[in-house]
Each structure stands twice: as structure tokens, then as C-alpha cells.
Amino acid sequence: MTRKNVLLIVVDQWRADFIPHLMRAEGREPFLKTPNLDRLCREGLTFRNHVTTCVPCGPARASLLTGLYLMNHRAVQNTVPLDQRHLNLGKALRAIGYDPALIGYTTTTPDPRTTSARDPRFTVLGDIMDGFRSVGAFEPNMEGYFGWVAQNGFELPENREDIWLPEGEHSVPGATDKPSRIPKEFSDSTFFTERALTYLKGRDGKPFFLHLGYYRPHPPFVASAPYHAMYKAEDMPAPIRAENPDAEAAQHPLMKHYIDHIRRGSFFHGAEGSGATLDEGEIRQMRATYCGLITEIDDCLGRVFAYLDETGQWDDTLIIFTSDHGEQLGDHHLLGKIGYNAESFRIPLVIKDAGQNRHAGQIEEGFSESIDVMPTILEWLGGETPRACDGRSLLPFLAEGKPSDWRTELHYEFDFRDVFYDQPQNSVQLSQDDCSLCVIEDENYKYVHFAALPPLFFDLKADPHEFSNLAGDPAYAALVRDYAQKALSWRLSHADRTLTHYRSSPQGLTTRNH
């Protein structure tokens, strides 16, 4: 069998509605430029209704790379270990003869049963998932990146992260139109791109699998010149939110927790104060900076795409572009990837098949989830989808179209124990194991079920931005019950099935897959 190339591009915190190709399809003039992603969309298939199955980064990447829902892999938060028993994409690729290279990060904490409690990997946010070979890691503690910056002659400040302060500033109150202290030649996006080109050139045309990760448009929200001034605040869309933070907080106890505790310093290096009190001008400026960071990534991808063109590998490479999760960007008075709103969970997905362009430039409306990426790659390479995998291959969408038995709802989860702020379990008075929610969403309704808090129910046709909770409305009681039953059925049908197809028999071990 002819060996094939795979380029899996995973950006960080890029939400789905910041994709110009989708804006044009909706008749809207794009407010940012991504010519290289536009090319990928023209030559590939763009999935409009794609979600990460969980947030934040560590859990989201665990789902992406294991094909498992959060309820099954249970790496429920950043720094929570991933059970060693779960097969991941890296290990599965090795089993079919690939040496999966990784640039970026997976934010994986190792299983403590496989090592010592003194393992240095337990002192950092995350490490590289087993099975992948790092050829340009960000982790641990961004040491690879900062070392590269220093090696190239840039003098790092005493606090290395001060490179993300605005030029000439020692502190910043929030959103800024000033450039980062770090020039674009030494930005983290450039670092990852240089590592990618070095790796690809070293392959000398041999087949490859490359996970190419980027840190942006993740905070801190400050961009290197000229990207800091590429977009004007007044050209950015206004935030979608209630009249004031108190009105937003009244919707649900979890919403109130985040409104009360979200801090600017998590998004603007050196800033202080509440993130929920950003005014509209600050939010528009934040979005302009966010777009600048996106365009910088797009320029970097252009360099990678150009190399594949020049070496004749573009038409031989499956390219998948996606993000780990989205970003609230001031919508609902929130920042980050939290809660239950669409802005945190809806993410880009673009797939360009190698030489197969039957649906080039089209937009797929079917419901896809991040857990579908792993089986898609394995099937494309001739491998098998692990039985435990919750996702399904998306390859049929690239050929004959959506299968008749495809899912009719989106599913996603959030475990909000001790996330980023002041321990939600304390402010909402829950045990850690009760700090979870799951969402069932279709084209008409969205149901949010909490382990130990009141549910939420939204009519997406009448209320697409999720302001009016109908869970307590008697007129919707039957629908709320139906969607609660759907949530229960979904969880039952996706319980761990790693070994459930095996049987002992007089003939020995047998299997039954259907």
C-alpha cells in the first residue's frame, strides 16, 4: 500500500464564527483576512456544526486524540492524569507503521501509576501524550520556545512572560492596540512554523504524520507588529450579552460564579480587575487583537502550505484544520472557555483530502464532534477505529455524503471543579464530583443537564444566543423531559466498551462486534 501524508493542524482557542469562509456563505463580509485558510476551505470540506466535546485544553485534547468523550477518558481538567489504558492516536499510528511527530503540545498529565510522584511532569501544566515524538514542543513551561528566542539573540526579561506585555508598558489594564514586546520573527507562531519546516525538510519527501500545534489565538491578547494594528476595534462585531453582568448572572448559579470570579489577568498579561466589566470598546479592541493573532497564524500556515506545494506534496497530503476549543471573547460577559455557551464549544473543522475534491469548497451542515478526528485519520491511512472510540470517521462526508444513520444531536461536557478561578465547587456549594454538566443540542433546542444544579433549556430558533432559560416553563415540560431522556440514553449507549465484544467459549476467546 502506498504510504500517505497527514498534516493535523490544531490551533488554540479559535472559535468557529471567526472563519471567513463561513461568513461569506452566510452573506456576511468577513472582518478578518485568512487567505491560506480560505484556500484550504476552497479545496476541502468545511464543517459548520462542529464542536469540541469538552473544555478546557487538556480534556479537549484528550478527547481529540483518544476519540473518547470526557465521561470515558476522565482527564476532566487540566493537570488531571490521563489513564494509561486509553489508546490514543499516536499509539494507534505507531501500530500501523507511522512515527507520529508532534509540534506544539497536548497538555497531558501522565498516569501516576506508571511513574514516581516525584516525576517532574507533575510540576507543570502538562506534557506530551505517549505515542507522539516531539519535534518542537512547547512544554514543559514553554522552555523550548523561550530557549529558541534567547538563542536567536533576543534578550528575555527577568520574568520571561513579560515579552507579552505591550511595547513600552510595565502594566496593562486590559485590551490594547499596542504591539507585543516580542517581534513577529520571534513569536511563538513563528517558532512552531520554523519547527514544522525543519521537520518536513528533514523528511526529504518521505511519508509523514505531523501534528502541528499553535498556541494562538490563545491569551494573552497582545500581538506582535504589524498584526497588532491590522484590524480596527470599530470594525469588530459587538459582544452578544445581557444588559449588564448582574442580568447575565441571574440565569444560573454557574454563570453567576464566572461573572463574579473571572479575572482580566488571565487574558491580558499584568492586568488586574474583573473580566466581566470590560466595556464594549475594550471588547472590540480585544477582538481586533484576536483577529491579528489569527492572521499571523494564517501567514505561518502559508509558509507550510508553500513548502508542500514546492515539493509536490500538497496533493498527497490529508490536511485537517481544527482547534481545541473556542473563546467567549466577551459574549455573555465572559472570557475564556467555560460554562455551556456555544462560543466556548463551537470550533473550526476543515478537511482537505489528498487528491479527492468531490466536495471542494462546500459546507457540511451535519453534526460533527472532535472525537471524530481520530477515526477519520486512522481510516484514511488504512487502520481500524478502536472499539472503545466514541467517534466515527468523517470520510463518508468527503465521498458520498452524510451517512443515513449519522448522529442527530451534538454532545459536549464540562467538568467545572477547580477550573481557573476560585473553586466553583465552593461558590455553588457542591462536592467536586458533582461539578459537571452535559449538553444535548440539535437544530431546534439545547438542553444542559447538571449533576447537582438546575437544568437549562433553550429554544434555539427563537433564542439563538441562549438568554431565556425555559427549563421551568410548564409549556416546555414535555420537551425538557424528552431531552433529559436523550441525555441519559446517550450516556448509556456510550459507556466504555473496550472489552465488551469479547466472549469466552468452549472454542476459546471469541469476539462479537454487532
UniProtKB/Swiss-Prot annotation:
Give a short account of its post-translational modification: The conversion to 3-oxoalanine (also known as C-formylglycine, FGly), of a serine or cysteine residue in prokaryotes and of a cysteine residue in eukaryotes, is critical for catalytic activity. Phosphate triester hydrolytic activity is retained with unmodified cysteine acting as a nucleophile.
Q: Which UniProt keywords apply?
A: Hydrolase, Iron, Manganese, Metal-binding, Zinc
- 3-oxoalanine (Cys) modification sites are 57
- Enumerate the SUPFAM superfamilies for this protein: Alkaline phosphatase-like (SSF53649)
Activity regulation summary: Anions including Cl(-) and CH3COO(-), and SO4(2-) salts stimulate activity 20-40% at 100 mM.
Q: Where are the transmembrane segments?
A: none
pH-dependence note: it reads: Optimum pH is 9.0.
Instruction: State the free-text cofactor note.
Output: Mn(2+) is probably the active metal ion. Other metals such as Zn(2+), Ca(2+) and Fe(2+) can also act as cofactors.
Free-text biotechnology note from the record: Has potential application in plant genetics as a heterologous conditional lethal gene useful for cell ablation and negative (counter) selection.
Coiled-coil ranges per UniProt:
none
Q: What does this protein do?
A: Hydrolytic enzyme with a broad substrate specificity acting on phosphate diesters and phosphonate monoesters. Hydrolyzes phosphate mono- and triesters, sulfate monoesters and sulfonate monoesters. Hydrolyzes glyphosate monoesters. Does not hydrolyze DNA or cGMP. Hydrolyzes glyceryl glyphosate, but this substrate has a much lower affinity than the glyphosate monoesters.
Q: What is this protein called?
A: Multifunctional alkaline phosphatase superfamily protein PehA
Q: Which organism is it from?
A: Trinickia caryophylli
Upper classification of the organism = Bacteria, Pseudomonadati, Pseudomonadota, Betaproteobacteria, Burkholderiales
Q: Which gene encodes it?
A: pehA
